[in-house]
Swiss-Prot record:
This is 2-C-methyl-D-erythritol 4-phosphate cytidylyltransferase. Catalyzes the formation of 4-diphosphocytidyl-2-C-methyl-D-erythritol from CTP and 2-C-methyl-D-erythritol 4-phosphate (MEP). The record marks R16, K24 as: Transition state stabilizer. GO terms for molecular function: 2-C-methyl-D-erythritol 4-phosphate cytidylyltransferase activity. The record marks R156, K213 as: Positions MEP for the nucleophilic attack. Keywords: Isoprene biosynthesis, Nucleotidyltransferase, Transferase. The gene is ispD. It catalyses: 2-C-methyl-D-erythritol 4-phosphate + CTP + H(+) = 4-CDP-2-C-methyl-D-erythritol + diphosphate. Disulfide bonds: none annotated. It comes from Neorickettsia sennetsu (strain ATCC VR-367 / Miyayama) (Ehrlichia sennetsu). Pathway: Isoprenoid biosynthesis; isopentenyl diphosphate biosynthesis via DXP pathway; isopentenyl diphosphate from 1-deoxy-D-xylulose 5-phosphate: step 2/6.
């Protein structure tokens, strides 16, 4: 078995967090940056040997202290692109020299990914899955608004909320990204969708409702609550 690498997409420059001038991945919860929690969660799995961060060099003053805190781990960097897809491709190109067998692609602002989810993704990959995406059921009622203003019901039993980390056979996802950039015809917001569009077989596994992506002000408060509970 080859190396399993983590790839954390941390190049986002915007934030929906009220009154924040920092990208959300650098905001602190209980004295630690969200990005550091995210990286440490990956390294907590014994099979993940290295983590690559895709960052915006303009945020150097924010990510260098995090790197110092992670000095005991194998962490590398590359420059983020204009879109998430650009950034993931940047990270995959940087990881190519390490020749990993698999890669877990993670959002920077998911600090509470559980060992159970990470282990399930890796287990599925090692059992032969080409791509693995954690998902959770939709709890709310969903409607679809048509252009004419007509609203139709959507069967939520058929829907799932997609989470990360999403795991892939490295060679297959790298080939899919190269094919996409040879003829970019669509914008993708997650790696599983791009993988499916390029012929990779993607399996869904159960995610975890606590694996939230920090996006809104309430998420920060909830993150603080979760950490308070975990340290009791």
């Amino acid at each position: 078995m080859g190396k399993i690498a983590g790839l954390v997409v941390a190049g986002g420059g915007g934030s929906r967090i009220t009154n924040s001038v920092l990208p959300k991945q650098y905001l602190q919860v209980r004295g630690k940056a969200i990005l550091q929690y995210t990286v440490e969660a990956l390294f907590a799995h014994p099979k993940i040997e290295c983590v690559h961060l895709v960052v915006n060099s303009k945020c150097e003053v924010h990510y260098l202290p995090i790197l110092r805190n992670l000095s005991g781990y194998v962490v590398s960097l590359s420059e983020a692109g204009n879109t998430r897809t650009d950034s993931v491709f940047s990270g995959l190109k940087a990881l190519e020299c390490l020749n990993p067998s698999h890669v877990l692609i993670q959002d920077a602002a998911r600090p509470f990914t559980t060992p159970k989810v990470i282990n399930a993704v890796i287990k599925s990959l090692l059992e032969g899955c080409e791509g693995v995406v954690p998902v959770v059921p939709v709890q709310d009622t969903i409607i679809k608004r048509e252009p004419e203003g007509i609203v139709t019901d959507v069967n939520r039993d058929e829907l799932r909320i997609v989470q990360t980390p999403q795991g892939f056979d490295f060679c297959k996802i790298f080939a899919a990204y190269k094919a996409h950039f040879m003829c970019p015809s669509k914008r993708y917001t997650d790696d599983g969708s791009l993988a499916l569009a390029h012929g990779i077989k993607v399996e869904c596994i159960p995610g975890d409702s606590s694996n939230l992506k920090i996006t809104h002000p309430f998420d920060l408060k909830f993150a603080d609550f979760l950490l308070a509970q975990s340290h009791r």
